[in-house]
Amino acid sequence: MFPTGIFLMSVLISQMQGRGIVGVEGQELVHPKKLSLLQKRDLERIHDSDTPEEYEEELLYEIKLGRKTLTLHLLKAREFLALNYSETYYNIKREMVTRHPQILDHCFYQGSIIHEFDSAASISTCNGLRGFFRVNDQRYLIEPVKYSDEGDHLVFKYNVKAPYATNYSCEGLNFTKKSTLIDAKIIEEHKVEDYHKEKFIELFVVADEFVYRRNSKPQNKLRKRIWGMVNFVNMIYKALNIRVTLTGMEIWSAGDEIEIVSNLESTLLHFSTWQETVLKKRKDFDHVILLSGKWLYTSMQGIAYPGGICQTLRSCSVVKDLLPDVNIIGNRMAHQLGHSLGMRHDDFPCTCPLGKCVMGAGSIPAIKFSKCSQTQYQQFLKNQKPACILNNPLPEEFNDYPFCGNKKVDEGEECDCGPVQECTNPCCDAHKCVLKPGFTCVEGECCESCQMKKEGVICRPAKNECDISEVCTGYSPECPKDESQANGFPCKNGEGYCFMGLCPTRDDQCAELFSGGAEESHSLCYRMNQKGNRFGYCKNKDNTFVPCEEKDLKCGKIYCTGGRRSAHLGEDKTYNLKNVKQNISIKCKTMFLYHNSRDMGLVNSGTKCGEGMVCSNGECIEMEKAYNSTICSSLCDENDVDDNEPDCQCEEGPIITEWGEALNLTSVSIMVVVLVMVIIGVGLVILLIRYQKCIKMKQVQSSSREIRGIENKVYFPDEHQTRSEPIFTDIYPLHNTAESLERVPSTFSSPHYITLKSVSKDPRGIADPKQNDNMNLNLDSQSDCTRLG
């Protein structure tokens, strides 16, 4: 027993020394105990799943740490990998090999500590428990003990008050306003509400040769290491309602693809050029991080472009990977990603307790983002509108997996504020995902203090004259869908027409491009659009600049005057024109943008170019044609706003947009009306002829009333009439019937049935067989006469 204890102690000491874990003040040997957990949602998933999973969806572990027992509640990180996840490496011949492994199962989890309100965890269960967890401000690292068959683990306690050396700093490239870059993709039209929803960052990770060499054995060691880092980053960014998902990784196993030097700024410039010109052509992502294991003689541990997310050239960063602790490297990745999202360091006056906040300096894993960082991030979203983080890259089955605590209101739930430990909503019962007694709502623009606002309360004021104010319904906590004035509605005193909820004008576009009071230049400038070069054209077809036609001149390149140099990545051009006759000098300033999916230098679509005319893709066309109002009106019902066409604001009556369509529609209508009238006329003629025949029959029949017959009873809707008439045994059965129906009240409008009450018998009491034959006669003619009577 004694030798075994000595051996175990020596193993623990060697593990601590070999790992070189930074910032810990103590460790403790623990034996995590797995608790049974099989709930209804687990049973449902087992029945629905065709492929059994090695790793469970939900786990409970009990850990006795000191005098306290902690219950670790873990949920599998469903948003961990993107649908198009890929792995790239290089063989001995430096040939690139790319795989797309179908990862159906993994061992990475996130969670919290039960009964601890402020807690979090990022754990892998691949071979024992390995990762990070915290309780309030205290943070821990847990790892399995090497060579132990008893399930022994070491829990290291991070020292919150540990000194922070300068070698744990980072650097962000500083840009002046002049060089701040905004890609056109960022400013594409998105509703403001989109930026309040959940965001998604598709992260790509590149590991240099040094990182590969230190983690090449066992074969999947580097993969699990990078996955652990991304899982930690994802846990951190959930506080900002952001999911960080790994879309792929590339391993420079045969040598670095760029020059990595001690100057991190130079390394970042090399890396940004490589990822834009090489990596972007074969892989889509929102941000890429280079993990460098090269011992760089610099105090900086990472570098990033501030506010660079979604920019083709600058959405990248470099992070040093020299320490064995995955959580510390993951924390640095989260820090650099924060710079890319517009966050600055938590320096004075934005302070944060040591080691607590992601954007502060520190050598141990952080806990959360400071209020300053959150404010800076929200301001970045408002100003820059990074569009790439709005699309959801996760597999559909990941998004649809229902359970109480996933922060999504699934079927059968009234609310879902996340795990019990994370829920801060006073309206929702986090244990059952139902509203607390007496409450009617949880959140929304029409929900206040857990109660719905009254009907008619404005929940979304009109942002401008092309917008429409929305009001609460009184029965829904959500504000109705954001609606706007119909495209083409006059605005700004007739200077423009509404388009997609805005009133685009050239003055506003100039102010956006060049700021500083820039406005539209003289109309003579637009003659430059006939040149057909980069600074004067209407269409760009495969880098061939098509000059404008006369009618489209004011829909090509926009020309401005005043303002400053453009803040966008591109080339400015100013023409100085002189008009000798009018003795005026004109400045015509325009620009050509780089790295853009659409050219902001062209006059915006929807801008007025004449009475009833607007610009559309470099052409000046009729407003009705541009907005396709015919389709709009056909989809709308009276004054309703069509849900499928947010651009349509419907008016009373049909909207005919083109004479050709109107004529076609009118022709069809006339043909239908004429055809109906012809059918009605023919029908009336036939009825008149039959009516005259019935009159003649009654005249013939009036001379033969001496014969007595059976009693007929005719049923009508409102009254009964009984009379005795003979039923002839010859070919004239209709005469009597017609005469009988002659006395039908004028209110009678439809034929009814006639029943026979009795039949005549001969003196012997035997019914006349001929009468039975008459009973079976066809009464169609009677019905015809009845209709005419």
UniProtKB/Swiss-Prot annotation:
One of its GO terms (molecular function) is endopeptidase activity. Residues 401-487 form the Disintegrin domain. Residues 26-176 form a propeptide. PROSITE patterns: ADAM_MEPRO, DISINTEGRIN_1, DISINTEGRIN_2. InterPro entries: ADAM_Cys-rich (IPR006586), Disintegrin_CS (IPR018358), Disintegrin_dom (IPR001762), Disintegrin_dom_sf (IPR036436), MetalloPept_cat_dom_sf (IPR024079), Peptidase_M12B (IPR001590), Peptidase_M12B_N (IPR002870), Reprolysin_adamalysin (IPR034027). Disulfide bonds join C310-C388, C350-C372, C352-C357, C459-C479. Residues 772-789 have a biased composition (Polar residues). Residues 199-393 form the Peptidase M12B domain. It is found in: Membrane. The keyword Methyltransferase does not apply. CDD domains: ZnMc_adamalysin_II_like. It holds the Pfam family Pep_M12B_propep. Its main location: membrane. GO terms for biological process: epididymis development; epithelial cell morphogenesis; positive regulation of flagellated sperm motility; positive regulation of sperm capacitation; proteolysis. Keywords: Disulfide bond, Glycoprotein, Membrane, Signal, Transmembrane, Transmembrane helix. Glycans are attached at N84, N167, N174, N583, N628, N664. GO terms for cellular component: apical part of cell; cell surface; plasma membrane. It comes from the Eukaryota. Residues 762-789 are annotated as: Disordered. Residues 177-668 are extracellular. This is Disintegrin and metalloproteinase domain-containing protein 7. The gene is Adam7.
